[in-house]
């Protein structure tokens, strides 16, 4: 991401461009690959690295798939578009999936490549703020109505904290040592530090808000009617994520090609940061999920008033059925560099 663009172009996530194409044909046809689409929730970045790696390193092709990855943007409705059959697969976060299901969207999570959410609150080192309880006497920029924003408001006293809308830029942060803002640890901190700031990240996961991020989702109908196709997509994506976490360089070059605003330095920074978020503390296969995590998130969204009790069912939000349980934890592999 070039300097000026980087300064102004970092924004909220959950978006997309309109596109077409739904899954078609039986999975596994060897002579002709099955064409499917994958809708991202944002412009291509490291949070999508494993899916691009599956393409770059041929894992989709080996599985008999021809995957078109469709970039997102500021107004995407990934869950709704996947549930409606406009796209075969999508990438979203767990809170957005539950919100979609609450509105009747029949979509389900298949793979959670990141164990820890990258969401953070970025503060200046000079502010003396070392933990969330220290957030006082500051301006705090957050997206109004976001799940994490509502959680923070309920969880913390936020004494003398002036909450303002997040505008997608780190410029105000750079101008005021008493300014804090939402961030993804692999994005905004790099921009701020490149522009001379010394930052500290307070991870939302450490406060207990840790929705699965970069989820691979599909229509529930596809899971029932095309399980072989879904299995191929999930396992190829698992391989892609393992490869990206081990060797991000080739995929970062592809990411830079499809999103020229991201330069290779920020992508290398992001790949290193995201590696720390991968893994699986549940003891299951990489990318696996637990009902306890989904139930915790569901209850948090009920507590903040964003969901009604009984409006969603955590056990129906995901399945680990299609994962390759023989794969090792990708974060435990030694990195071969950029």
Describe each model-derived feature in a short phrase:
Residues 295-338:
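Conserved C-terminal helix/tail region of periplasmic/extracytoplasmic solute-binding proteins
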Residues 11-16:
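Bacterial signal peptide processing site
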Residues 1-9:
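Bacterial N-terminal signal peptides
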Residues 20-166, 172-186, 202:
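Short, glycine-/small- and polar/acidic-enriched structural segments
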Residues 225-307:
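Secondary-structure end/capping motifs
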Residues 95, 168-261:
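Pocket-lining segment of extracytoplasmic ligand-binding domains
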Residues 68, 76, 206, 269-275, ...:
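Short linear loop/turn motifs
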